Amino acid sequence: SRYGVGYDKVDVAAARELGILVSIAPGANSNSVADLAMALMLAAARHVCPMDAAIRAGQNSKPTTGVEMWGKTLGVVGTGRIGKGVIQRAAGFQMKVLANDAYPDQAFVEAHNGTYTDLDTLFRESDFITLHAPYTEETKNMVDSRRLKEMKSTAVLVNTARGGIVDEEALYERREDVAEEIN
């Protein structure tokens, strides 16, 4: 057994040769991951980690409130079990939902203040973006330099899916660009 889901870190061919059954337990951690995605968005929005570090260092005189999530636009890439769980949780914040999925569930998303859209629009218009897509050749580096530049400089990106969906070098470069814009 391993922490997480998926086969991308398992040598399935070797396991098969050794007679080891490899399987997944779909949905086993869906609620936990949806909770985590919301917690990460809240922590980023409210500057929880920097404020904690400042307070621990005795630097609690610089107030920062961050931003509210209430009424903001949430982009959800992948509306399977986890993506739907995040959408349900976002309803409590009256968030507008922009969703994208190869297999859209129109009725579900519309019932939760959302609409399906293309990825470019989702990245351009969202205040928070959360990734819940599988890692495939089609999704590899899906979040690339171009998409990162389309994002609002204040937008928050949360990836609880596979790391390879985000081009990490492009993410680092965009982070540096945004830091220069702010300073």
Where are these regions (language model features)?
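Short, well-ordered coil/turn residues at beta-beta hairpins
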Residues: R2-Y3, H132-Y135, N159-T160
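Short beta->alpha connector loops at strand-helix junctions that form conserved
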Residues: Y3-G4, G19-N31, D101, L119-D120, ...
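Phosphate-binding beta-alpha-beta segment of Rossmann-like dinucleotide-binding domains, i.e.
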Residues: L18-I20, A25-T73, G85-Q88
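Short glycine-rich, flexible loops that bind phosphorylated cofactors or substrates
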Residues: D8-K9, T136-E138, I165-V166
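An N-terminal-biased, well-structured beta-alpha scaffold segment characteristic
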Residues: S1-S23, R124, D144, K149
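Rossmann-like dinucleotide/phosphate-binding beta-alpha-beta segment
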Residues: P63-S153
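NAD(P)H-binding Rossmann-fold N-terminus in SDR/SDR-like oxidoreductases
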Residues: G6, R81, G85, I165
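Rossmann-like dinucleotide-binding domain for NAD(H)/NADP(H)
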Residues: L18, V22, S145, K149, ...
